[in-house]
């Protein structure tokens, strides 16, 4: 292995910050009028979290009418459970350990397998930054395969599969039997573009999950060294998921900031997190994040490998990269972005592009290929990479290193040449029973977005598609969460399984916490719009509940049911801050005399009154006839 040429500098300030990591950083979330609920599986240790939003009663002339609680998908882990004990220095509970032990196909290693991992574990300069509750890593027994795809193809339903089936179902099968949800569960028919979307919640079974994984249409990213994970699924025939990025850089951000940013991302609804750190203490930062993450963690291993060479792409070697893969797999990374489709012969195709190669990983591998005039070592060593992946159940996120960086370059020869190669690599990974998803663009004008989905389905055999947006225009720096959210909603509808968020700082700088919040909310919105459009069962429940609350002027319920309750309430209170305004039958937009919903209610009340009068007159007429129709008795 190549000896690393660069040793990260330590920071006394960062050590002091780590010493202060506690609930004081605001990691326990308090969602308004919400309750954490656990759905019980077939065994005691399958407890699936969801959040129920309680609603106020509706008051009519006939009295109070109860509004039922609304269940919502919850990614917040222990941070959203008021009863949970939280200690970032101890990490999260190991909910999967018993499942892993019972399968009997893994072994606890006596020590780390990665040379760099061993070096970091014994480096006194980083002792003050290390997570101290590290356990020995787990690996498949010799010659074994421990992937969820391997089990699914053998007809085995794992606890992870049952967990995600319950999680996707969100107890809507139970609610569909209750009369109080009858109107709320009505929704428009979706257009699924050939996807096999369940038509009723009771079809979302562990067996359905197993079949989707076995077919390669879905993955459960779940490294055996991430026992803290609450399993989730990424696939075309499930809810659209979103990924949030974080990571330090050589310019800014600290280890503590990244841990806080990870927890903050969960608060707003990130389904997975990618740690894209390129600055100091990459190894230690990742350990802290994984040990405290209830969601899958992804990385781009070539970033850390490059850091080990001092930033010199030409000095990258297969041995160095292999050791980095093992280092990260033994920490518990759930999926790797691997840019194995950037082939030497594709690089010249990008010469006429307006913005060339914009992927960091893609540009690193392109530079290596040109410097050595050899084929991409990630491609030539792909089978060996698969051997590592299946020993830890790390999923592939096959990187789009030649994705377009502007709409002018969208859907060009180099982009689709790489995509077709990713399809070839998908087939190769599947021969090893390694789980795969495919990364997609990028920057694509709206009229050409669907073509990307069609190409991916055809050439990558329905492996889950994972896209960065796409951005549908290039004229809005500072607003690229919106330009990309438009493309994301569309491509999610067409079949993309996971959307990688974009923040307002895209192309401008490293995002801070508020940028992360804005990016995640934007992408939760895009994913939800896609779920509505493709007809996911129960997707419209929350919309209907919020619409009913809006019509009935239940302001607090409107805030509670929204994706960002705090912001919704703060916008309302900017003009009507008084508590009485929370029950007023108008807002500051129209005022009390011009509110369309208030007028509609008055029209309905008037119509009801007229109807009552007509009924009264009709009843009197019938009574008059029954009494002989005499005017005077």
UniProtKB/Swiss-Prot annotation:
- Pathway, per record: Cofactor biosynthesis; thiamine diphosphate biosynthesis
Q: Its GO CC terms?
A: cytosol
Q: What is its EC number?
A: 4.1.99.17
Report any one BP term from Gene Ontology: thiamine diphosphate biosynthetic process
The residues listed in the UniProt record as binding Zn(2+), with positions renumbered to this chain, are 443, 507
Entry keyword set: 4Fe-4S, Iron, Iron-sulfur, Lyase, Metal-binding, S-adenosyl-L-methionine, Thiamine biosynthesis, Zinc
**Listed InterPro entries:** ThiC, ThiC-associated_dom, ThiC/Bza_core_dom, ThiC/BzaA/B
Q: Which cofactor does it need?
A: [4Fe-4S] cluster
Q: Which residues bind substrate?
A: 245, 274, 303, 339, 359-361, 400-403, 439, 466
Reactions catalysed, semicolon-separated, are: 5-amino-1-(5-phospho-beta-D-ribosyl)imidazole + S-adenosyl-L-methionine = 4-amino-2-methyl-5-(phosphooxymethyl)pyrimidine + CO + 5'-deoxyadenosine + formate + L-methionine + 3 H(+)
Q: How is the cofactor bound?
A: Binds 1 [4Fe-4S] cluster per subunit. The cluster is coordinated with 3 cysteines and an exchangeable S-adenosyl-L-methionine.
- Establish whether keyword 4Fe-4S is in the entry: yes
Pfam families per record: ThiC-associated, ThiC_Rad_SAM
Looking at the keywords, is Methyltransferase present? Answer: no
Highest taxon of the lineage: Bacteria
| MF terms in GO | 4 iron, 4 sulfur cluster binding; carbon-carbon lyase activity; zinc ion binding
**Ligand binding ([4Fe-4S] cluster):** 587, 590, 595
Write down the PANTHER family for this protein, in alphabetical order. Answer: PHOSPHOMETHYLPYRIMIDINE SYNTHASE, CHLOROPLASTIC, THIAMINE BIOSYNTHESIS PROTEIN THIC
- Main role? Catalyzes the synthesis of the hydroxymethylpyrimidine phosphate (HMP-P) moiety of thiamine from aminoimidazole ribotide (AIR) in a radical S-adenosyl-L-methionine (SAM)-dependent reaction.
**Subunit info?**
Homodimer.
Family, according to the entry, reads as follows: Belongs to the ThiC family.
Protein name, UniProt field? Phosphomethylpyrimidine synthase
Record organism:
Neisseria meningitidis serogroup C / serotype 2a (strain ATCC 700532 / DSM 15464 / FAM18)
């Amino acid at each position: 292995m190549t000896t690393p040429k660069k040793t990260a500098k330590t920071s006394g300030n960062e050590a002091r910050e780590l010493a202060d990591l506690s609930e004081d950083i605001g990691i326990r979330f308090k969602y308004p009028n919400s309750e954490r609920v656990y759905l019980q599986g077939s065994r005691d240790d399958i407890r699936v979290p969801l959040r129920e939003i309680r609603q106020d009663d509706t008051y009519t002339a006939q009295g109070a009418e109860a509004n039922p609680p609304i269940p919502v998908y919850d990614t917040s882990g222990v941070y959203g459970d008021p009863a949970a004990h939280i200690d970032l220095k101890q990490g999260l509970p190991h909910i999967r350990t018993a499942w892993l032990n019972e399968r009997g196909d893994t072994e606890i290693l006596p020590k780390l397998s990665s040379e760099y991992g061993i070096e970091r574990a014994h480096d006194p300069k980083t002792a003050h930054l290390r997570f101290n509750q590290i356990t020995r890593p787990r690996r498949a027994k010799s010659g074994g395969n421990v992937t969820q795809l391997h089990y699914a193809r053998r007809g085995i339903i794992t606890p992870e599969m049952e967990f995600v089936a319950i999680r996707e179902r969100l107890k809507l099968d139970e609610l569909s039997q209750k009369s109080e949800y009858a109107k709320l569960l009505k929704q428009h028919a979706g257009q699924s573009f050939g996807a096999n979307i369940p038509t009723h919640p009771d079809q979302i079974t562990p067996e359905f999950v197993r079949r989707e994984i076995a077919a390669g249409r879905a993955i459960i990213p779940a490294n055996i060294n991430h026992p803290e994970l609450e399993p989730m699924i990424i696939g075309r025939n499930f809810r659209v998921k979103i990924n949030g990025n974080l990571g330090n850089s050589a310019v800014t951000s600290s280890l503590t900031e990244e841990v806080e940013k990870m927890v903050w991302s969960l608060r707003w609804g990130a389904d997975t997190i990618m740690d894209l750190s390129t600055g100091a203490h990459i190894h230690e930062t990742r350990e802290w994040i994984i040990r405290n993450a209830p969601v899958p963690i992804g990385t781009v291993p070539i970033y850390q490998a490059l850091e080990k060479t001092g930033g010199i792409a030409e000095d990258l070697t297969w041995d160095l990269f292999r050791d980095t893969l093992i280092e990260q797999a033994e920490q518990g990374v759930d999926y790797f972005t691997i840019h194995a489709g950037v082939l030497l012969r594709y690089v010249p195709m990008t010469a006429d592009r307006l913005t060339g190669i914009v992927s960091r990983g893609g540009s690193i591998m392109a530079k290596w290929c040109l410097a050595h005039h050899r084929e991409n070592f990630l491609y030539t060593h792909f089978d060996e990479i698969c051997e590592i992946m299946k020993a830890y159940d790390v999923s592939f996120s096959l990187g789009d290193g030649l994705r377009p960086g502007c709409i002018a370059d969208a859907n060009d020869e180099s982009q689709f040449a790489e995509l077709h190669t990713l399809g070839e690599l998908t087939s190769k990974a599947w021969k090893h029973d390694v789980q795969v998803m495919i990364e997609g663009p990028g920057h694509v004008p709206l009229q050409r977005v669907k073509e990307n989905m069609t190409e991916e389905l055809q050439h990558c055999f329905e492996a889950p598609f994972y896209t960065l947006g796409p951005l549908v225009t290039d004229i809005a720096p500072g607003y690229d969460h919106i330009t990309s959210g438009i493309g994301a909603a569309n491509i999610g509808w067409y079949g993309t399984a996971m959307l990688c968020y974009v923040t307002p700082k895209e192309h401008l700088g490293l995002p801070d916490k508020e940028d992360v919040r804005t990016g995640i909310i934007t992408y939760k919105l895009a994913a939800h719009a896609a779920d509505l459009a493709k007809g996911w069962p129960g997707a419209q429940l929350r919309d209907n509940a919020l619409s009913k609350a809006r019509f009935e002027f239940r302001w607090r319920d409107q805030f509670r049911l929204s994706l960002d309750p705090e912001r919704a309430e703060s916008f309302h209170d900017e003009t009507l801050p008084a508590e009485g305004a929370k029950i007023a039958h108008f807002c500051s937009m129209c005022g009390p005399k011009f509110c369309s919903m208030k007028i509609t209610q008055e029209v309905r009340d008037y119509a009801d009154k007229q109807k009552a009068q007509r009924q009264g007159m009709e009843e009197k007429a019938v009574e008059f006839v029954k009494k002989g129709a005499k005017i005077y008795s």
